[in-house]
């Protein structure tokens, strides 16, 4: 029973994280909520590409 509960909780947490990442993609230079303004520039300064904004956190960059 406990393994099933852990599996269900893990699936719920992962689906919430994926949903947040999918909904937080922003077009243009500015991010959402309290993210760093000008995410594209922030990522480029690190040598990365802007991917998405994590609400209330920071920019999500990718190689």
UniProtKB/Swiss-Prot annotation:
Disulfide bonds join 35-53, 39-59, 43-61. Keywords: Disulfide bond, Ion channel impairing toxin, Neurotoxin, Potassium channel impairing toxin, Secreted, Signal, Toxin, Voltage-gated potassium channel impairing toxin. It is found in: Secreted. GO terms for molecular function: potassium channel regulator activity; toxin activity. GO terms for cellular component: extracellular region. Expressed by the venom gland. Residues 1-28 form the signal peptide. Its main location: secreted. May block voltage-gated potassium channels (Kv). Belongs to the short scorpion toxin superfamily. Potassium channel inhibitor family. This is Potassium channel toxin MeuTXKalpha4. It comes from Mesobuthus eupeus. The lineage of its organism: Eukaryota, Metazoa, Ecdysozoa, Arthropoda, Chelicerata.
